[in-house]
Amino acid sequence: MALPLILVPAGCSTGGSKQVRRPGIAPRLSAVQEEQTRQCLANLAGTGVMFERLPDRSYGGGCSAIGAVKLIDIGVPVSNLGAMTCGLASNFSAWARYGATPAARQILGGELIKIETFGTYNCRPIAGSARLSEHGRANAVDISAFLLADGRRIDIRNGWNSSDEKVREFLRIVRASACKRFRTVLSPDYNAAHHDHLHFDNGGRGGYCR
């Protein structure tokens, strides 16, 4: 595992303006939370994923990046990844490896060479709400497109209701795979705010897949 670096988390490019806040001292974790984070980091390292442990940060307004990592190599390149909670990073890595990659091969007949995202951390409320988004806790990631070795780029905006049956099937399969790993998964079927991306997060009570 690489030595930790102090990095400012990347913001998400959709669903609200990005707020720049100076990092402060994060609240102290309980012994249980510290043990959960330690175990998560050990499990993530055991999968062969390369990552950097980030320092805990509080950005004010309820926004924070606690128990977070920056993924370096999960087996397929991913754009725009900033701070992610360890649990989110673990689930995302597994989804990319065991969900998206084989789905591209089996359904589209191509090798997945890149996953494009709109980012992870972004201190903002949920679109149309005053409630803080899970992005504000580094606990969400938005997927925008998939790039294949043959040059095809499958993006959510144009692919979700594509005339190509295989493209539609692929995107719904990767959503279904995500629903097995994340507490909340939102797609263009949820609302217009998600017309161009798949939102995955580990917040709330879980069990919401749309």
Region locations from a protein language model:
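Catalytic cores and adjacent binding grooves of peptidoglycan-active enzymes
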Residues: 15-18, 60, 66-68, 132-210
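Active-site-adjacent substructure of cysteine-protease-like catalytic cores
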Residues: 106-138
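Second-shell loop/turn segments in exported
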Residues: 25-31, 82-91, 129-130, 156-165
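C-terminal motif of bacterial Sec signal peptides marking the signal peptidase cleavage site
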Residues: 8-11
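Active-site acidic/histidine clusters and adjacent loop/turn architecture
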Residues: 36-115
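Post-signal peptide N-terminal segment of mature Sec-exported envelope proteins
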Residues: 20-46
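Sequence contexts marking disulfide-bonded cysteines in secreted/extracellular proteins
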Residues: 13, 39-41, 62-64, 85-87, ...
